[in-house]
Swiss-Prot record:
It comes from Lactococcus lactis subsp. cremoris (strain MG1363). The modification Glycine radical is found at G749. Belongs to the glycyl radical enzyme (GRE) family. PFL subfamily. The gene is pfl. This is Formate acetyltransferase. One of its GO terms (molecular function) is formate C-acetyltransferase activity.
C-alpha cells in the first residue's frame, strides 16, 4: 500500500541523523560526511550465517548447477521491463524464506530478452542456445524498433569498418550495451522515489532556454522521472512502498536492492556496478543497533541475503561476448573503506560485514569486492582484508592517494574493474563513464611498420602510411612511424566512441541509472589499451638491442630477429619504464585533443579483462613475442602463439620479483591513465614469510608501500592505483584449474571461477608469473619511513 509521503514521514525516517545540507537537495555524499562513524576495531564483532541463509544459498546453488547441465530458461516472448515482469522469488513456494526481495526476472535464473542494444544480437543469443524468439514479437520489433546497433552501423565510417575488420579497433560496445554507469542507489533508501521525482520535476521546470542541449536534457529528465515511477511499481510487486524513504537498515538494504534490480531488469551493460553502498548502510545499522531495533546477527543476515540476491544476477550473452569477458562476470563492484577529506578514514563495520560474506555464504566472484586502500586505514582492517585475500583471493585494492590527485573525491567508487568514478562530484567531473573497451596498440604499430597493411593478412590495407623499409630498425624512425599510426588509431577510435554513445543515448538511454544521479553530469570517456607490455618491450628492443626485420619477396615484414639484451617493462629499469610512460602520454594526449560526445573527458585504462587472449589471436609476430600467422590455405595458425599479458601487467618474460613489477607500474603517470592501471598478481605464500601471520603482515606492508607516494621509490611521488591480489601456489591450483574444478581467482579487473574459462584462457592464466620471490635484489627494502 502506498504511503502519502509527508514531512512527518521524513522526520520519522531521518530521526537521529545529523546535518541539514543533505536534506533539501539529494546528496548521499553530504549525508555520509555528516553521519558516518569510523570504526577502529577488529572483526571480533562479526556474526556467522544462519540456517535460513544457508538454505537460501543451497537453493540458489542447486538451481544454477541444474541449469548449467540442462540449459538456462530464456524469455522468448516478452521484452524485458522494470515493472511489467512479475515479481520473482528464490522459492516461489516459500516466499517468506527471503528477507530482502527483488529479482531480475519472474523466475530464478530466467534470462531477460533485451533487444534494444541490438535485435540481431539478442536473437542470435537465443539461437546459440537452441531457441528462437516468438515470431510475432520479432515482426513487431523488426518493424517498429531501431536498436543501438542499427544506429551505430548507419553512422560508422569506412575507416572504422576497416579497423574493426582488421581487429585493431574491436570489442567495442557496438554489439552489446555499454555499462559502466553507476547510479547512487542509496538515494532511494535515503530519500524515497517521491522525493527524487519531485526534484527531477523542479530541475525540468528550471530549464527555460530552448536549444539543442536543453531540449535533449529535458527529454532525458522526463525519462528519468518515468523510470522512477517504474521503480515504485517494481517495489509494489513485492508489497514494498519505495516512494518513501527507508525507516531502518533492513529497509535501506531492501530499497537499494529494488533500485539495483530495477536496473538489471532493463540494462545489460558490460558492467553493472553497485557503487559506494556499505558506508551508507552502516549509518542506518549503527542507528538501529543503538536503538535495539536489530541485533548484529540480524544485520549480517540481511547483508548475506542481499549478497545472495546479487549473486543471482545473470545476463543472456553471445558467444562472441564471452570471448572478451569470460566467466560470465557482471561486475557488481562494491567499494568500501577509503579516506575522507577531513583526514578521517572511512572504514565502517559494514565493510567488515560485506567482506565477511566470503565466509558466511562462501567465496564467489560476485559482488566484485573492492577496498579503497590508504596506509592510514586502521591496521586491524588492513590486516583483516589481507587475511581474507590470503584465504579467498577474491578482493581487489585501489589506491586512494593516486586517484585523489586527479579529482576523485571522498565518495568515489569503482566501476566495472578498476575505473574510478565520483557520481555525485559537484565540480562536474568523473560522474559517469562512457565505456570504450580497448584497442590493440601493438597491432597498430606493427601495421604501421608495414605501410598500413595488416600484420597478419598482408593483402589487407587498413590505413595509409609510409612503411619503414630499414632492415635494422632505427628507434627514431620507428617512433616517427608509430606516432603517425597512433594518430590514425586515436582518430578512428574517437569517431567510433562518439557514434556509439550518441546512438546509445538515442536508442537505449539508461534512464533508471541516470535517475539516481545528479541531473547535470559530465562523463569520462574510457579509452583502453591492449598489448601494452609488448609494445613497450618492442620499442625497448629496437632502442637498446638490434632488431632485424624478416621480409617476404614483396618487402612485407613477417617476423623479427633480436640480437643483444634490452630492458623490459616490469624490471624496474627506467630505460624501459620511461618508454612505457611515453607511450601512455602520446596515446592520452592524442585522445584528449579531440572533441568528445557531450564534452566528455578523455580517460585511458590499462585493462583487458580476458580479451588479452582474444587480441593475442589477432596479432602477428612482434620483436618480443610470437603471434599468429597464415597457413597457405589462408587459415590462421596459432601453434607458436604467446599470449599478451593482461592489463598493465609486464610480460611473462620480464625478469624480477613482485616488487620490481610494482615499481614499474608505480612510475606510470595516473593522469595519462586515470581510467585505471590494472595489475593482476599471483604471489606464493612462501614468498611472503614462513607463517601465515608473517605472510599477512607482509602483505599489509607491501600494499601500504605500493599505494603510498614515494614509499616504493624513494625521492619520488610514484604510487600505484590497483592490485588484483591472488595468494596461491601454481602447483596447488594448476590441476584443479585444468580439470575444471571451482577455483576463484582475480584476473584483469574482476574475479572469476576458472571452471568457466576456455581452454586457451586457462592456459594463459597458468602461464602467468606466479611470484615465488618478492624481489631479485637481496638488499631490497621499501622506504617505510615514507608511509
Amino acid at each position: 500500500m502506498k504511503t502519502e509521503v509527508t514531512e512527518n514521514i521524513f522526520e520519522q525516517a531521518w530521526d537521529g541523523f545529523k546535518g541539514t545540507n543533505w536534506r533539501d537537495k539529494a546528496s548521499v555524499t553530504r549525508f555520509v560526511q555528516e553521519n558516518y562513524k569510523p570504526y577502529d576495531g577488529d572483526e571480533s564483532f562479526l556474526a556467522g550465517p544462519t540456517e535460513r541463509t544457508l538454505k537460501v544459498k543451497k537453493i540458489i546453488e542447486d538451481t544454477k548447477n541444474h541449469y548449467e547441465e540442462v540449459g538456462f530458461p530464456f524469455d522468448t516472448d516478452r521484452v524485458t521491463s522494470i515493472d511489467k515482469i512479475p515479481a520473482g522469488y528464490i522459492d516461489a513456494n516459500d516466499k517468506e524464506l527471503e528477507l530482502i526481495y527483488g529479482m531480475q526476472n519472474s523466475e530464478l535464473f530466467r534470462l531477460n530478452f533485451m533487444p534494444r542494444g541490438g535485435l540481431r544480437v539478442a536473437e542470435k543469443i537465443l539461437t546459440e542456445h537452441g531457441l528462437s524468439v516468438d515470431p510475432g514479437l520479432h515482426d513487431v520489433l523488426s518493424q517498429t524498433m531501431t536498436s543501438v546497433n542499427d544506429g551505430i552501423f548507419r553512422a560508422y565510417t569506412s575507416a572504422i569498418r576497416k579497423a574493426r575488420h582488421a581487429h585493431t579497433v574491436t570489442g567495442l560496445p557496438d554489439a552489446y550495451s555499454r555499462g559502466r554507469i553507476i547510479g547512487v542507489y542509496a538515494r532511494l533508501a535515503l530519500y524515497g522515489a517521491d522525493y527524487l521525482m519531485k526534484e527531477k520535476a523542479k530541475e525540468w521546470d528550471a530549464i527555460t532556454e530552448i536549444n539543442d542541449d536543453n531540449i535533449r536534457l529535458k527529454e532525458e529528465i522526463n525519462m528519468q522521472y518515468q523510470a522512477l515511477q517504474e521503480v515504485v511499481n517494481f517495489g509494489a510487486l513485492y508489497g514494498l512502498d519505495v516512494s518513501r524513504p527507508a525507516m531502518n537498515v533492513k529497509e535501506a538494504i531492501q530499497w537499494v536492492n529494488i533500485a539495483y534490480m530495477a536496473v538489471c531488469r532493463v540494462i545489460n551493460g558490460a558492467a553493472t556496478s553497485l557503487g559506494r553502498v556499505p558506508i551508507v548502510l552502516d549509518i542506518f545499522a549503527e542507528r538501529d543497533l543503538a536503538r535495539g531495533t536489530f541485533t548484529e546477527q540480524e544485520i549480517q543476515e540481511f547483508v548475506d541475503d542481499f549478497i545472495l540476491k546479487l549473486r543471482t544476477m545473470k545476463f543472456a550473452r553471445a558467444a562472441a561476448y564471452d570471448e572478451l569477458y569470460s566467466g560470465d562476470p557482471t561486475f557488481i563492484t562494491t567499494s568500501m573503506a577509503g579516506m575522507g577529506n577531513d583526514g578521517r578514514h572511512r572504514v565502517t563495520k559494514m565493510d567488515y560485514r560485506f567482506l565477511n560474506t566470503l565466509d558466511t555464504i562462501g567465496n564467489a566472484p560476485e559482488p566484485n569486492l573492492t577496498v579503497l586502500w590508504d596506509s592510514k586505514l586502521p591496521y586491524s582492517f588492513k590486516r583483516y582484508s589481507m587475511s581474507m585475500s590470503h584465504k579467498h583471493s577474491s578482493i581487489q585494492y585501489e589506491g586512494v592517494e593516486t586517484m585523489a590527485k586527479d579529482g576523485y573525491g571522498e565518495m568515489s567508487c569503482i566501476s566495472c574493474c578498476v575505473s574510478p568514478l565520483d557520481p555525485e562530484n559537484e565540480e562536474g567531473r568523473h560522474n559517469l563513464q562512457y565505456f570504450g573497451a580497448r584497442v590493440n596498440v601493438l597491432k597498430a604499430m606493427l601495421t604501421g611498420l608495414n605501410g598500413g597493411y595488416d600484420d597478419v593478412h598482408k593483402d589487407y590495407k587498413v590505413f595509409d602510411i609510409e612503411p619503414v623499409r630499414d632492415e635494422i630498425l632505427d628507434y627514431d624512425t620507428v617512433m616517427e612511424n608509430f606516432d603517425k599510426s597512433l594518430n590514425w588509431l586515436t582518430d578512428t577510435y574517437v569517431d567510433a566512441m562518439n557514434i556509439i554513445h550518441y546512438m546509445t543515448d538515442k536508442y537505449n538511454y539508461e534512464a533508471v541509472q541516470m535517475a539516481f544521479l545528479p541531473t547535470k553530469v559530465r562523463a569520462n570517456m574510457g579509452f583502453g589499451i591492449c598489448g601494452f607490455a609488448n609494445t613497450v618491450d618492442s620499442l625497448s628492443a629496437i632502442k637498446y638491442a638490434k632488431v632485424k626485420t624478416l621480409r617476404d619477396e614483396n618487402g612485407y615484414i613477417y617476423d623479427y630477429e633480436v640480437e643483444g639484451d634490452f630492458p623490459r617493462y616490469g624490471e624496474d629499469d627506467d630505460r624501459a619504464d620511461d618508454i612505457a610512460k611515453l607511450v601512455m602520454k602520446m596515446y592520452h594526449e592524442k585522445l584528449a585533443s579531440h572533441k568528445l560526445y557531450k564534452n566528455a573527458e578523455a580517460t585511458v585504462s590499462l585493462l583487458t579483462i580476458t580479451s588479452n587472449v582474444a587480441y593475442s589471436k589477432q596479432t602477428g609476430n612482434s620483436p618480443v613475442h610470437k603471434g599468429v600467422f597464415l597457413n597457405e590455405d589462408g587459415t590462421v595458425n596459432k601453434s607458436k602463439l604467446e599470449f599478451f599479458s593482461p592489463g598493465a601487467n609486464p610480460s611473462n618474460k620480464a625478469k624480477g620479483g613482485w616488487l620490481q613489477n610494482l615499481r614499474s607500474l608505480a612510475k606510470l603517470e595516473f593522469k595519462d591513465a586515470n581510467d585505471g592501471i590494472s595489475l593482476t598478481t599471483q604471489v606464493s605464500p612462501r614468498a611472503l614469510g614462513k607463517t601465515r601471520d608473517e605472510q599477512v603482515d607482509n602483505l599489509v606492508q607491501i600494499l601500504d608501500g605500493y599505494f603510498t607516494p614515494g614509499a616504493l621509490i624513494n625521492g619520488t611521488e610514484f604510487a600505484g592505483q590497483h592490485v588484483n591480489l591472488n595468494v596461491m601456489d601454481l602447483k596447488d591450483v594448476y590441476d584443479k584449474i585444468m580439470r575444471g574444478e571451482d577455483v576463484i581467482v582475480r584476473i584483469s579487473g574482476y574475479c572469476v571461477n576458472t571452471k568457466y574459462l576456455t581452454p586457451e584462457q586457462k592456459q594463459e592464466l597458468t602461464e602467468r608469473v606466479f611470484h615465488e620471490v618478492l624481489s631479485n635484489d637481496d638488499e631490497e627494502v621499501m622506504h617505510t619511513s615514507n608511509i
